[in-house]
Design a protein with these regions (language model features):
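Aromatic (tryptophan-biased) beta-strands that constitute blades/sheets of beta-rich domains
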Residues: 60-138, 148, 153, 158-166, ...
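Hydrophobic/aromatic beta-strand positions that recur at structurally equivalent sites within the blades
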Residues: 168, 207, 249, 288-289, ...
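Hydrophobic single-pass membrane-insertion segments
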Residues: 46-59
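N-terminal Sec-pathway targeting helices
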Residues: 24-37
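Hydrophobic membrane-insertion alpha-helices, especially the h-region
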Residues: 34-47
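Repeat-blade elements of multi-bladed beta-propeller folds
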Residues: 96-109, 133-165, 179-205, 218-247, ...
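N-terminal intrinsically disordered, acidic low-complexity segments at the extreme N-terminus
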Residues: 1-19
Length: 503
């Protein structure tokens, strides 16, 4: 269900009966003047056209809104007068940031996940390389012509030779270097030529992005799950660990700058708008600090139907406009989508998501982050086969699109590429949804070596907790400026996707 766009019109209410086209009451005494008036008007226009009009004025060309005589109140309410795309469709496809590299989880330090790049219409696998298991935190980065990814090795939670960080050529998949670790590597961040990595062995590494050599390493003594937040201009790195400790390092040398504490493990990592930093602890504790670590505000986020008892936070927050968007999970389903928006300035609650579109009755636990595009937030809904869009200002559901098989879990966060939402799902496939038409425009299967959908994919119960055939995708995709999409699979392959027409 899609809400209708409200239009303001200068035409007034519909014409009532007994009124003619001139808006006059249907009286005989007045009707006799109508035909002569039309004749006079026609003669006047003819005289202007042939005798008085400026013959040097431009003929043809593009008529802009500044040139048009149509009143701007005919535009959808709130539409920008100079946005032709918005005028035609009523939908904004704009990103709030300009990205040239995918240097962080969901592209940037705000985690909005939106980039302007060529879109794929006929997907193909450009290359496929075994790197080791790509879990929920093993989402790649793309900087220039290089792809960086952390690996959980051949078996998660155990020591093996595949644990570490890899660098690949974006176009060929050729390995450029490998940096080994003792246990699973988790999240990555990039800034000033340095890859920052976290891992299960409780260390934070600064690695030279050019050759994979170690620049610095610091030991926290407890697993670091989340994605490092790298503020490049400030040479600042912020990481969270399993004890809920937030630690800031100097990007260049790993020097300790400050530490803070939140309630519960920090699983998804921190987020920033470049001035403030927001960290969410698993036990609903959300802390905002400045770049010196000084506390700005701290709040406990409570979901409506849990009274704070069971709700937890796993995913990294998203900062967009004046909002900090938090997703949540619990042991049971939610009555409404499990998403809350806080005011960036003070942490007060702005909205909690509501399903006014009537999409479903039981909403699942969300372990992924949202992406932001135009006036929408988009994400993959668990306990479903749906991509869901919310109004960014109200948190109300706007629309949904079927994407693949019905699965209970959902881990990957989406990316938005020039109006296409790219989302991988637990069923092992990746999907593209056109925002303007609200339709799925392509899909591609990543859960096996052949790259073909299993024969039983469309059967009832194919996915549920795990696909009956093939492997899931838990990691989130990265998008290059040339339109390539890169993501890792639970089978252990890193896959680059392009368009067949690109050659």
């Amino acid at each position: 269900m899609v809400r209708r766009t409200e239009y303001a019109s200068f035409l007034g209410p519909p014409r009532r009966r007994n009124r003619d086209f001139a808006g006059l009451e249907n009286r005989v005494a007045l009707r006799v003047f109508v035909l002569p008036a039309l004749v006079v008007g026609f003669v006047a226009i003819s005289v202007w056209w042939f005798a008085l009009r400026d013959d040097n004025s431009a003929v043809g060309g593009v008529l802009t809104l500044e040139d048009a005589t149509i009143p701007t109140v005919l535009l959808p309410s709130g539409a920008a007068a100079d946005d032709a795309g918005l005028l035609l469709s009523g939908v904004s496809l704009d990103c709030e940031e300009e990205l040239t590299n995918w240097t962080s989880f969901q592209g940037s330090i705000t985690h909005q996940g939106c980039i302007k790049a060529p879109t794929i219409s006929n997907p193909t696998i450009e290359w496929r390389i075994f790197t080791g298991i790509a879990g929920w935190l093993n989402s790649p980065l793309i900087v220039g012509d290089r792809v960086f990814v952390a690996s959980a090795g051949r078996a998660q939670g155990t020591e093996d030779a595949r644990d570490g960080v890899y660098a690949y050529n974006l176009y060929t998949g050729r390995q450029e270097w490998f940096f080994g670790a003792t246990l699973d590597m988790n999240g990555l961040g990039y800034g000033n030529g340095i890859i920052v990595a976290t891992g299960d062995e409780g260390r934070v590494w600064g690695i030279d992005a050019t050759d994979g050599s170690l620049i610095w390493v610091e030991t926290l003594g407890v697993a670091t799950f989340g994605y490092p937040l790298v503020l490049e201009e400030d040479n600042l790195v912020v990481v969270g660990d399993a004890d809920g400790v937030v630690t800031a390092y100097n990007l260049r040398n790993g020097g300790l700058l400050w530490q803070r504490q939140v309630d519960g493990p920090i699983r998804g990592g921190a987020v920033s708008d470049g001035e403030m930093i927001v960290i969410a602890g698993e036990n609903r504790d959300v802390l905002a600090v400045d770049k010196n670590g000084t506390e700005l505000w701290r709040v406990e986020v409570r979901e409506r139907d849990t009274e704070g008892a069971l709700a937890r936070i796993w995913a990294a927050p998203t900062i967009v406009r004046d909002l900090v968007v938090i997703t949540m999970l619990r042991e049971d389903t939610f009555a409404e989508p499990a998403i809350t928006a806080l005011r960036k300035s003070d942490g007060s609650q702005v909205w909690q998501a509501m399903d006014i579109a009537g999409i479903k009755n039981e909403w699942g636990s969300i372990r992924s982050s949202v992406a932001a595009v135009g006036d929408l937030l988009v994400y993959g809904e668990p306990y479903s086969d749906r991509l869901v869009a919310l109004d960014i200002e109200t948190g109300e559901t706007a629309w949904d699109v079927k994407t693949g098989a019905y699965c209970f879990p959902h881990w990957p966060s989406p990316a938005v590429v020039s109006g296409q939402v790219i989302i991988a799902r637990h069923d092992g496939a990746m999907y593209a949804v056109d925002i303007e038409t609200q339709t799925k425009v392509w899909d591609i299967y990543l859960g096996n070596a052949a790259g073909t959908f299993p024969a039983d994919f469309d059967t009832a119960g194919f996915c549920e907790w795990a696909p009956q055939t093939g492997y899931s995708v838990l990691a989130s995709p990265a998008v290059a400026a040339n339109g390539y999409i890169v993501v890792g699979t639970l089978e252990g392959y890193l896959v680059a996707i392009s368009d067949r027409s690109w050659g």
